[in-house]
């Protein structure tokens, strides 16, 4: 009988490695508060934005919900999700200052950003492009044009490099939100807006008149997206990575993808299909 109990204990420990030792970092904090604070962008469709009922929705929000369910399973308690709106400028500071526990939006994973925050496995792959009114007929000719972009983003950095390398003289106009960008485009205050192509598609869809816009097919950057969390928190990162890997292995990620991209993506990109294969890491 003792032998059977010992074997059962070993099996339980392997099925949930984190239960085999004391909780640390964010997991310990969540166990005490029974709450996880999720940072999200309010105007980054289809990755994260406010739905018609005023609640956060989107591709990244769904991924974070899967992480929360895994945390509840590990802790054995119900965990409340508290959504905290963040901006492009303060999202990483919010993690550093312990105001949020997990950043769920359209965040590009870079080496330099890894100096201040940590990242999960990749959750999406996209690239920066331009959106303009169809009537402007912009075709990669931005000489003397006004180009809007969100400050503090990798797109802003890539845009500055693109214009410098091409020796194009254009005015960069920083906008606070995607809604402001749409208004600026419609009023003619800017000639084009630069952002991740997937974000541009989402913006067009919620504008109310998507056929008025043209999104250039060419990309001028590589944007690997991931969820972000605090540095030096290996246990919490392991939980998130385990969830993401399982979504890829089980192909459940395809259901989430179709929910948010199926209406305008006739077929998945080869880069995303490759991402599924590469991130389906064995348990």
Name what the model sees in each region.
Residues 21-104:
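Extracytoplasmic small-molecule ligand-binding "clamshell" domains
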Residues 40-46, 56-73, 107-108, 126-179, ...:
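Bilobed "Venus flytrap"/periplasmic-binding protein-like clamshell domains
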Residues 65, 76-142, 214-217, 280-283:
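Acidic, polar ligand-binding/catalytic clefts
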Residues 75-87, 168-178, 184:
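Short beta-strand-to-loop elements that line the ligand-binding cleft
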Residues 90, 104-115, 158-163, 186-221:
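A ligand-binding cleft/hinge motif common to bilobed small-molecule-binding domains
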Residues 42, 124-132, 197, 204-245, ...:
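Periplasmic-binding protein-like
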Residues 21-22, 157-175, 211-213, 244-283:
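Ligand-binding clefts/hinges and TM-proximal coupling segments of bilobed small-molecule sensing domains
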Residues 21, 27, 58-70, 136, ...:
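Extended ligand-binding regions for polar small-molecule ligands
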């Amino acid at each position: 009988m003792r032998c059977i109990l010992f074997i059962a204990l070993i099996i339980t420990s392997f099925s949930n490695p984190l239960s085999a030792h004391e909780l640390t970092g964010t997991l310990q904090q969540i166990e005490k508060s029974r709450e996880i604070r999720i940072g999200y962008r309010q105007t980054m469709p289809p990755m994260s934005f406010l739905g018609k009922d005023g609640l956060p929705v989107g591709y990244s929000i769904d991924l974070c919900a899967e992480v929360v369910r895994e945390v509840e399973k590990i802790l054995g308690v119900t965990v409340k999700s508290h959504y905290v709106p963040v901006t492009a400028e303060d999202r990483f500071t919010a993690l550093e200052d312990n105001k949020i526990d997990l950043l769920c939006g359209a965040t590009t994973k870079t080496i330099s950003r890894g100096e201040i925050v940590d990242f999960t496995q990749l959750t999406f792959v996209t690239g920066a492009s331009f959106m303009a009114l169809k009537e402007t007929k912009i075709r990669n000719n931005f000489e003397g044009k006004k180009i809007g972009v969100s400050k503090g983003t990798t797109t802003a950095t890539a845009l500055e490099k693109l214009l410098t390398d091409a020796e194009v003289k254009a005015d960069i106009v920083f906008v606070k939100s995607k809604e402001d960008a749409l208004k600026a485009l419609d009023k003619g205050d800017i000639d084009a807006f630069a952002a991740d192509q997937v974000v541009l598609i989402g913006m067009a869809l919620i504008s109310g008149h998507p056929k008025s816009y043209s999104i250039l097919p060419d990309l001028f950057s590589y944007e690997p997206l991931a969820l972000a969390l605090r540095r030096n928190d290996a246990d919490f990162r392991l939980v998130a990575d385990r969830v993401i890997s399982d979504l890829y292995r089980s192909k459940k990620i395809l259901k989430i993808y179709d929910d948010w991209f199926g209406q305008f993506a006739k077929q998945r990109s080869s880069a995303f299909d490759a991402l599924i294969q590469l991130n389906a890491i064995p348990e």
